Structure formats: structure tokens, C-alpha cells
Amino acid sequence: MKEYKVYLERARSRQQHFLYPLLFREYIYGLAYSHNFNRSIFLENVGYDKKYSLLIVKRLITRMYQKNHLILWANDSNKNSFWGYNKSFYSQIISEGFAMVVEIPFFLQLSSSLEEAEIIKSYKNLRSIHSIFPFLEDKLTYFNYVSDIRIPYPIHLEILVQILRYWVKDAPFFHLLRLFLCNWNSFLTTKKSISTFSKSHPRFFLFLYNFYVCEYESIFVFLRKKSSHLQLKSFSVFFERIFFYPKREHLVKVFAKDFLYTFTFVKDPNIHYVRYQGKCILASKNAPFLMNKWKHFFIHLWQCFFDVWSQPRMININPLSEHSFQLLGYFSNVRLNRSVVRSQMLQNTFLIEIVIKKLDITVPIIPLIRSLAKAKFCNVLGQPISKPVWADSSDFDIIDRFLRICRNLSHYYNGSSKKKSLYRIKYILRLSCIKTLACKHKSTVRAFLKRSGSEEFLQEFFTEEEEILSLIFPRDSSTLQRLHRNRIWYLDILFSNDLVHDE
């Protein structure tokens, strides 16, 4: 208990001041920040960094307290501006810039915790979202049951504010935060739902939601370490700062009342937990009743600690060999490969059946076509269409854009067990590129291909990947064919895109 108190005191000393550096420290405006949040695999957002300036945020926060500058039209609903600008645009600027400022100290704190855990050397290798799949290939084939869990989120923004207050020291920060979430948001929309706020202020909502997930995972990891025979080394523990022990005792009492045991009953050394965004995968090798205990643990944790309602029927426990789960834009399941081996001992011959488990990862073709249709590359049936908005660009720019999209898709989905779906997506993009160029030159597709040469024109769509692989591996046709059949994970993919978002 003493070491826990020391940890709590040390963690309280790390509470941050936010408004002081935001308002008074000029050097913070020179910080370069990477805006990977809105990057899309289909279209790059231009001018994102120029729109959200910390200097503008500082001026807006200063003017929020000057009431004579605030001009609102309560009777005229057609006027949607104050200070001479659009309200939603000002709100977006404040939320984005505000999220940028508060992310900086927490990122530095995460880096310091990684140094304390002595895994800072491998931190760069863990940044790639593709690093999850080699881990699943090594571990998941030894497990028997899997639970696909969608993490519930609070229905009220005040719950997210209460979670954030464990880390923040200055009270004016919360006055500004509640002003923005309650009063300010009421100017923008009559619907005060959290879904509306998440759509209008995605970056700021993502910041608050990440802290909710961080707090819930910190308690889970803390209790997991106490209930496991093995010691976890690759996790940093961030558990709740205020009223942690009374809540923990209450949670233990709930389990003792329901199951007549404490957390020591839920000892499962062979369990793995993987999360990305709002979905997590829980896999276990032991009997399903232990998975059921962890299921009820998550439900009680969300209800008792965070006042978040979760329906038990939404958490299913399925045999891994019979169930496919979706994670990071892939469909994954464990396939059983059966083979018969003939064994002979003296004059007796035996047939031995060997079952080998293999992780099968496939590309979800329907969500991919839906994403392409949303980006106006094809219709909902997968038939390619032209991209008229790109017709004003040069031929080189149009081809370069389509090649960049194909390259991103090829890199991301090269880990698939079957490449047929990936080749179909490339075919859709190739025909969409041809139709876009034909639309620009005001000719038919057949006439354009006849004039430019169909074989040489779009050969880059299929030869570029082979040229890259030939630089790494020997120029052998059999080697390249084998590489096309096998999975290749690119461990330099650092940003998410529309394809991996859980809907």
C-alpha cells in the first residue's frame, strides 16, 4: 500500500497547467505539429495547418472575456456569425487549437513513462499500426476463444471532463472547457448530444475520448497485473488518481457478491488484449467461463467507475476457429489446415492426421468498395466512374494521384492472405483514372486508349510494386511470385485512414 501511495503522490505532482502557457508563453506558437488526424488514404487535405493557428486561438480566448465584442442575434436565425465571422468556423478553430495545446504535455508525459519502462528503444518500432498483425500471427494461433468488444463511450460530455480533471491542476482550464462544451456549443446547435459534438469537433472529442480509454485501460492493466501469475513488462500503468481505492474495493465487493470470489479467481496467464480506436480484441486459451468473468469485469468497470452503460449481449465469446473478427480494416480468423501423414513401423502402417492452425487475414471487399464509392471513384456496385473534380489538373498530376492511392492501398493490404480483392480494387482505380483522363480530353475511353496506348499507359499500376520488391529480393520470377502470394507487412505505416475506422 505504501508504494501505491508514493505512486499516487508522484503522479499528482505531474498535473499540468494549460492556460498559462497557452496565454502567456510565446514560444509555444513555434512548435511544429504533425496533423495526421484528418489524413485520408484517398485525398490529402490541403491547407489544414494554415487554418488552425495557435495565435488565433490565443486571441479568441482573450476576447471571450470581453463581452462588448460578443455580438449575437437571438431573434434572427438567418444570421450565423459573430465578431464578423462564421460561428462554426470560430468554434472549429478554438477546438482544434485547444486540442493541439493540451496534447503536447501529455505526449511528453507518455514519452517519459516509456523511458521509465525501459522500452523507449523499441517505441519507434511499435508506432506502426501494422505491428499488431505480426503479434497476432505469433500469438493468436495458440488461443481457442476470442471476444470482439466495442468500447462504449459516455453519453454526456461532463463524464469526459471529470476524467480529465485527474490530470489538470489549474481551475481556469475547466471553466474554459465547460464554457466551450456547454454554453458555446449551445450557440452552434440545438442538439447537445455527444455524437453531434464528435462530428463538429472531431479532434477535440478524440482527445477527450482517448483519456477516457486511457483511464479504463489503466485500471484494467493494474488489476490484470495483480491477478496474473506473470508480470507484465510492456505496459505503463496510469490508474485513476482520485477515489481509486474506494472504487476498487467496491468493485471487489461486487465480484465477491456475484461470484463469491475476489479478483484472484480471475487468474488467466494466457490472455491477450489488443485495442485500436473503439474496438478491442480479448483472446484466451483457457475455458470460456474465464472469458465470461472478464466480460462481466469490463461491464462492472464501465458502470461503476465511469457511469457508462454497456449491454452484456453486445460482448460475444466465440471459438476462434469458427469466428471472424474485424480489426484495422482486415477480416481475421484462424484456419485449420489438415494434412495426413503416413507412418510405418515395422510392418504396420498408420495414417496420422495433423492439424495446423494458421491465421487467415483477408481484405473486406465490400467496405472497400463502399469507401471508394464514397470518394467518388465508383458506384455502390463497384463500377468505375470518372473523377470530374480532378479534370482541371494536368495528366501527370491525375496519374500521380491515382498512383499514390494505389500505392497506399497496396502497402496497407499487402498483408492479406488472398490478393484477389486487392487486384480488383486496383482495377477499379485504373479504369477510374482512364475515365477521368478521357473526360478531361473530351473523348471516349476507347478513343483515348487507342491514342495513348493501353498497354504502356497504365503499366505503372502493376509494375511499380514489383520494381520495389526487386530492389530488396533477387530478380527471380519464382521469388516474386512467391512474395505476391505471401503476406508482407510494412512497419512504417503511422497514420490511420478511412478504411480502418470502425463504423
From Swiss-Prot:
Superkingdom in the source lineage: Eukaryota
Predominant place of localization: plastid
Compartments, as annotated in UniProt: Plastid, Chloroplast
Record-linked InterPro entries: Domain_X, Maturase_MatK, Maturase_MatK_N
Keyword Cytoplasm listed: no
GO biological process assignments: mRNA processing; RNA splicing; tRNA processing
Keyword line: Chloroplast, mRNA processing, Plastid, RNA-binding, tRNA processing
Cellular component annotations (GO), alphabetically ordered: chloroplast
GO molecular function, one term: RNA binding
Pfam families: Intron_maturas2, MatK_N
Family listed: Belongs to the intron maturase 2 family. MatK subfamily.
Functional summary from the UniProt entry: Usually encoded in the trnK tRNA gene intron. Probably assists in splicing its own and other chloroplast group II introns.
PANTHER family found in the cross-reference section: MATURASE K
Name of this protein: Maturase K
Species: Vicia sativa
